[in-house]
Amino acid sequence: MASKSDKQVTVEVNNNGRSRSKSRARSQSRGRGRSVKITVNSNNKGRRQNGRNKYQSNQRVRKIVNKQLRKQGVTGPKPAICQTATATLGTIGSNTTGATEIEACILLNPVLVKDATGSTQFGPVQALGAQYSMWKLKYLNVRLTSMVGASAVDGTVVRISLNPTSTPSSTSWSGLGARKHLDVTVGKNAVFKLKPSDLGGPRDGWWLTNTNDNASDTLGPSIEIHTLGQTMSSYQNTQFTGGLFLVGLSSAWCFTGYAANPNLVNLVKSTDKSVDVTFEGSAGTPLIMNVPEHSHFARMAVEHSSLSTTLSRAGGESSSDTVWQVLNTAVSAAELVTPPPFNWLVKGGWWFVKLIAGRARTGARRFYVYPSYQDALSNKPALCTGGVSTYTRQSNPVRTTLQFTQMNQPSLGRGATPATLGRSIPEPGDQFKVIMTVGALVQPNRSDTQNWLFKTVTPPTGHDAARVGWNTQHYLTIQGFLLIDSLEWLTPNLQESQEPPLIPELGVYIGIHKKALVYFMQQYVNPHTNNKHQVSSIFLIKPTENFSVTNYMSYFFRESQSDQNVANLKIRPQTWQQTVNFQRGKWYLVTNTAIRNGPPPSGWVWDNIELTNESIYYADQVLAHFINPPPQNSKIYFEVHTTMPQSRARSIGLEEDQTDNWQEPDEDLQTSTEESDYETDSLEDESDDEDSNTCRELVINTLVNQGISRERATYIGMSAYPNVEWGSGEQSTSQHIQEISSDDVGAGAHYSCVCERKQQSLNQGSRGHAE
């Protein structure tokens, strides 16, 4: 207490857990607690103090008291290091329903404060959190920076509130007002300020850093941001769907107690913007969340979760030791049907999950749902008291947006192979796994009829067929076509990847004009009969300009046999002349299917054969998607190549009647009959083969000296001199080298040019020896 007469300040701190009798002997009370009494004489014996001296006196008293409290150990350990940082955590979206919607839930543990798109990237706060065992906050400022003008939108108010326990709860807008909160008007910047008294931990103000420890000691408080009222555009009088605020944290994190846990910096935080979610459960069983196994969240959970050998408390199935926080920020949160009694948990917008070992028969990944982080650590899933009624059961999953955060890492030390930070960029030639989202139907296709395909390789008079290939003798006529809305590129080990470069050797041609680029190719060869094989090819193309294709079209149908219980898949004999429009910048999946006679082919097959009426086709990996139009927004998965399989380039030749040149041959490349006869005879002479080898080596060495890679130069040389000599009527080797050196087009164009000239020469000579 403070005495007014002598200006003495007395501070008494008693940290004994219980009261003690005054009659108890002093020896019996030792070690049971300590009472700290500090008396400070702040009286100035001189003249009366002015305002400045009073402030200095108060500062002196405060320093003395703090020093004595630290000596007695009642204020916790001294900070070893403090880090001031500003973190930008994402955006606050608009309200789409008019009800209370959660937009963000920010956990303040330093290893969890990450951007929702940051993956495993980390900053100085996360790095320090992985090196020290305890943390606390000196202060915290939550800054909302407006992304729209005050007059641009209306109808919505934003509320920032402090959740001191970081536990999901069923809270209404009025309940949020009972917390410490700040209401923000859209269009104005705001700062939500918190003091140390709002952020103190259970250990003299400190929190534990390791998230594997008790939840009440590690998570710290959390910041929740909600919106109320539908967001409308003032200018258009329509619903506004953009972002309202940019969220940032400004704070000073203090750390003490060095204890390195390197893997804490690798905790993942990301967003899955389109995922189908369902919940299941019955009386007495755990609540389970299902997501597709190809979704971004499922892949990340499988990659970063470590499965334990212990069994679940109620389900009997093994679950992971890794806990994930899931935040549903989409409008569909209220549409998710959940078994009782945890409807409030899902509609509240965020919960915790752990991956269940194995996958469901439907191909989905399953997760146990937990109402709190402590329950997840203790492996106590939410138990249902009943199932979903028939009237409310969903026929289709709800598509929503999930923000997910990896909460813990069972193994905290650094393994033999450190985790790779950031996103890897694929090298050319890699194989990829691609998940494609189907777009709208391309006319003349309709949802209630079979898929139209280009049937013939010979178009109507005055029109050209669309061909995809790499030169005049190696191409396929486009048959099937499908609009693709979006693509997700994955590496062979299911890591996210950037879009690979185009395949420079390939293109889509209408006549002699290149209309589209090719980004991947894949071919499937399936045995048809003992001496036949069905070859189906797919290509992903992107038009560089708008173009139309007019050709004879038909569709597949099931033909029933009277003596058999099977229905054969055949192409309709009747054809209709139709026009299909391809739009610039859109993705299209195009296909070609052919029945090949003979032994099993090796390498890539360029058989430009039309769909025949008598042939029976199989619904293979490609045709299964082109018999009937797939639903819009459905997913299609393929494993593809993003470069030409170079070892297969000339493995399969075409018959004369299957070849259709895109360009007229140059007059300089025409050879006389005598020259062709001479070339045919020379193929039987071994000395001429040696000359051909010499010319080939000359071309290769010249290209290498001019900067082209050895592999590419060899590829061009082998194609220009396939063990035959050029006719005397062709251009000389030096002329070809000069053209390759001076031309501005790429190596793929040079290669095609050389191959076309050589092939035209061979066609005029002895074609049988060319191959």
UniProtKB/Swiss-Prot annotation:
Pfam families: Astro_capsid_N, Astro_capsid_p. Residues 19-35 have a biased composition (Basic residues). Keywords: Capsid protein, Clathrin-mediated endocytosis of virus by host, T=3 icosahedral capsid protein, Viral penetration into host cytoplasm, Virion, Virus endocytosis by host, Virus entry into host cell. Disulfide bonds: none annotated. Residues 654-692 have a biased composition (Acidic residues). Residues 649-771 are annotated as: Acidic. Residues 1-59, 653-694 are annotated as: Disordered. GO terms for cellular component: host extracellular space; T=3 icosahedral viral capsid. Residues 71-263 are annotated as: Inner core. It comes from the Viruses. The record marks 313-314, 393-394, 423-424, 657-658 as: Cleavage. The keyword Transcription regulation does not apply. This is Capsid polyprotein VP90.
